[in-house]
């Protein structure tokens, strides 16, 4: 009985003691709003999920953008190939015409030599030396007659040798002309074939882009929505973290750990490395500003009036011909700017105006800074497939037809034209335009390439793990962290310093 009473008293005492604990929990819940049914949107798990969502959308955009860039640069390559084939055909035609003139000259030489030989033979026959011996009055006449005969024989042999040489030259030139004709015919066929390939590549790119346009827009919208949601949650998180500081001291709650945000920097661009400094390895840490020098950079205008656009509406052949026409004009602009740049440095211009990197090392840094200054002046200019030439942004082709801007290789073409370096409008060709440097040793002013054989993308390394690029359709010229994914093992250096 005593044991039962004691047990009952214990249970009652426990329930009474539990009342303050329950009341305290309810009070804390009321003060801090932490009901079990309300999930904290700024919780670490939610933030991590949203960050992963943004990263996933970025990755998808990067992959699709890479596929589109590859297709676009394939068209740029095809157009460059057309230009090379047409140049080869024109050179072969000039060689053929020179060969034909050579054959005509050889025929004329044979005809002249034959006439001289015929005249000599007739004179010898009519006035042969046989009667001279009979009419000679003294031995001296005989000696003179003999000498004259020997001279005539030597002259005859000389005329005959010239005739034979002329005939041999004729045969050689006719053979060379035949080879030139075959070469010209093959070059013409190659030019036609390369044009067909370019047309096919352009049509394929048009079809591919049209098919991918919807997906590109969907992914861009998905990425924008995910980023907006992440920004909103981060804002809520920042507001929520400030609330506990205002709570009454009488009812302190354990301080919540700050929500882990993997990257507090601005939202990454598609495919960007979260830590460009770590990714940079041994890349230079040169400051992004121009090197200290006595040059007055303000007097070097990095732009020129825009030259006519490459875009022509209509069939692909018209587009290709227009692009090649603008390339010719762009080359002349490059030559003019090359002369101007060298004159600014106090160096006599090259005969053609094209420096093609042949700039004295003592002026190399100034040249690199001028190239970069030209590029940085275009930040914010839209991406335009096929856009960009030596004078600045231009309307592109197909999807870039309505946009004045640059594509990746067009931006590099524009930047280096300022110092007289002529580049093709194709990243793969630009990759082979200078000295290859291991990417771990790249420095300010080197070109960075992406994709197999540099066929996908090109950018300019600025130093400190940053690069200048015209990345993809829908974007614009901007500075981005260097991406190592897909990078070629070498960068290209056009200017030494």
Curated annotation (Swiss-Prot):
Query: Can the keyword Secreted be found in this entry's annotation?
Result: yes
Q: Which branch of life, at top level? A: Bacteria
Q: Where in the cell is it found?
A: Secreted
Signal sequence extent: 1-39
Name the SUPFAM superfamilies for this protein. Cysteine proteinases
Q: Give a Gene Ontology cellular component term annotated to this protein.
A: extracellular region
Entry's Gene Ontology BP terms: cell division; cell wall macromolecule catabolic process; cell wall organization; cell wall organization or biogenesis; peptidoglycan catabolic process; proteolysis; regulation of cell shape
Q: Where is the active site?
A: 408, 457, 469
- Principal EC category: hydrolase
- Annotated region Disordered: the residues are 177-198, 253-297
Q: What's the EC number here? A: 3.4.-.-
An example of a GO molecular function for this protein is: cysteine-type peptidase activity
Q: Which Pfam families match?
A: NLPC_P60
Q: Summarize the protein's role.
A: Peptidoglycan endopeptidase that cleaves the bond between D-glutamate and meso-diaminopimelate. Binds and degrades high-molecular weight peptidoglycan. Required for normal separation of daughter cells after cell division and for cell wall integrity.
Descriptive protein name: Peptidoglycan endopeptidase RipA
């Amino acid at each position: 009985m005593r044991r039962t009473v004691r047990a009952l008293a214990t249970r009652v005492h426990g329930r009474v003691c539990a009342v303050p604990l329950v009341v305290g929990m309810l009070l804390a819940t009321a003060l801090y709003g932490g009901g079990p049914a309300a999930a904290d949107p700024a919780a670490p798990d939610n933030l991590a999920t949203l960050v992963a969502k943004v990263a996933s959308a970025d990755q998808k955009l990067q992959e699709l953008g890479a596929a589109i860039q590859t297709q676009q640069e394939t068209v740029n390559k095809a157009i460059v190939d057309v230009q090379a084939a047409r140049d080869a055909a024109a050179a072969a035609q000039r060689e053929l015409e020179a060969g034909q003139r050579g054959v005509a000259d050889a025929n004329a030489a044979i005809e002249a030599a034959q006439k001289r030989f015929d005249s000599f033979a007739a004179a010898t026959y009519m006035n042969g030396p046989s009667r001279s011996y009979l009419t000679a009055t003294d031995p001296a006449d005989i000696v003179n007659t003999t000498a004259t005969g020997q001279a005539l024989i030597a002259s005859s042999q000389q005329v005959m040798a010239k005739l034979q040489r002329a005939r041999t030259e004729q045969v050689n030139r006719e053979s060379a002309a035949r080879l030139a004709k075959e070469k010209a015919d093959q070059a013409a066929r190659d030019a036609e074939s390369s044009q067909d390939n370019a047309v096919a590549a352009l049509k394929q790119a048009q079809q591919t882009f049209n098919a991918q346009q919807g997906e590109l827009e969907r992914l861009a919208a998905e990425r924008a929505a995910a980023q907006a949601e992440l920004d909103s949650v981060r804002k809520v998180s920042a507001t929520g973290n400030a609330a506990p500081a205002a709570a009454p001291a009488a009812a302190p709650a354990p301080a919540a750990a700050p929500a882990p945000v993997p990257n507090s920097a601005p939202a990454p661009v598609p495919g960007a490395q979260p830590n460009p400094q770590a990714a940079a390895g041994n890349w230079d840490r040169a400051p992004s500003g121009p090197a200290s020098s006595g040059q007055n950079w303000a007097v070097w205008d990095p732009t020129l009036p825009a030259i006519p656009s490459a875009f022509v509406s209509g069939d692909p052949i018209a587009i290709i011909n227009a692009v090649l026409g603008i390339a010719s004009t762009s080359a002349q602009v490059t030559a003019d700017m090359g002369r101007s740049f060298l004159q600014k440095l106090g160096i006599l211009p090259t005969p053609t105006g094209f420096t093609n990197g042949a700039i004295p090392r003592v002026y190399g840094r100034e040249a690199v800074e001028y190239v970069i200054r030209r590029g940085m002046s275009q930040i914010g200019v839209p991406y335009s497939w096929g856009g960009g030439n030596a004078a600045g942004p231009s309307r592109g082709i197909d999807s870039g037809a309505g946009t004045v801007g640059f594509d990746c290789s067009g931006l590099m073409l524009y930047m280096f034209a300022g110092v007289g370096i002529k580049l093709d409008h194709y990243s793969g060709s630009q990759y082979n335009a200078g000295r290859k440097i291991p990417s771990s040793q790249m420095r300010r002013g080197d070109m960075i390439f992406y994709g197999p054989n540099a066929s996908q993308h090109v950018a300019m390394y600025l130093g400190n793990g940053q690069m200048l690029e015209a990345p993809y359709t829908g974007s614009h010229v901007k500075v981005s962290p260097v991406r190592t994914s897909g990078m070629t093992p070498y960068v290209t250096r056009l200017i030494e310093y």
